[in-house]
A protein has these predicted regions:
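Alpha-helical cap/lid subdomain in secreted, periplasmic
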Residues: 31, 49-167
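Active-site environment of divalent metal-dependent phosphoester hydrolases
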Residues: 9, 46, 141
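Acidic/histidine-rich helix-loop elements
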Residues: 11, 36-44, 72-76, 158
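Serine-esterase "nucleophile elbow" of acetyl-processing enzymes
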Residues: 1-41, 51-59
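A short linear-motif detector with a strong N-terminal bias
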Residues: 15-16, 43-44, 112-113, 139
Length: 167
């Protein structure tokens, strides 16, 4: 899994992060997959693009790409984010590696035009590169009544899922 602090498991014991929990779920459900935690706290789409070749050992036959949250936090132009993600998927396509793209959803604080441009990146890339696609790691944390992320599922920083949120 190529990602940032959400993938890495920021603020959690190593075995309680997303990758180990997902690995456990897959194993319990008899899915023969070995997940590798390629999450780096603070990573951006550019950082992910720059370290991709280093992560692609011959045994890798699929990659989950969960990047873009730090691009958002830093207010990077959506075109910059999209270009970096395109480089990642061009490389994966050339190597014949299947991919799952996990999107990010922009808040409104950068304005409606920024949100529109940013939120269009992920479905567009999923279509362009024929990727498996999940709209956000946060989707399961959204309260159906309020349509907001349940704060009891987040760490004190309000950004990273706590142990219950990872579950």
């Amino acid at each position: 899994m190529l990602g940032d602090s959400l993938t890495q498991g920021y603020g959690l014991e190593e075995k309680k992060g997303l990758v180990p929990k997902l690995q456990n779920w897959l194993s319990t459900n008899n899915v023969e997959v070995l997940l590798i935690n390629g999450g780096v706290s603070g990573d951006t789409t550019l950082g992910g693009s720059e370290r991709l070749d280093w992560l692609l050992t011959p045994s890798i036959n699929g990659v989950v790409v969960a990047l873009g949250g730090n691009d958002l936090l830093r207010g990077f132009d959506p075109k910059f984010t999209k270009n970096n993600l395109q480089e990642i998927f061009k490389t994966l396509k050339l190597k014949g590696i299947n991919s799952l793209l996990v999107g990010t959803i922009s808040p409104l604080n950068y304005g409606p035009q920024f949100k529109k441009e940013h939120d269009a990146i992920y479905p567009s890339l999923a279509s362009e590169y024929n990727l498996f696609y999940v709209d956000s790691l946060f989707s399961p944390l959204i309260d159906k009544k309020t349509q907001e992320i349940s704060v009891n599922l987040l760490q004190a920083d309000g950004i990273h899922p706590n142990e219950k949120g990872v579950e």
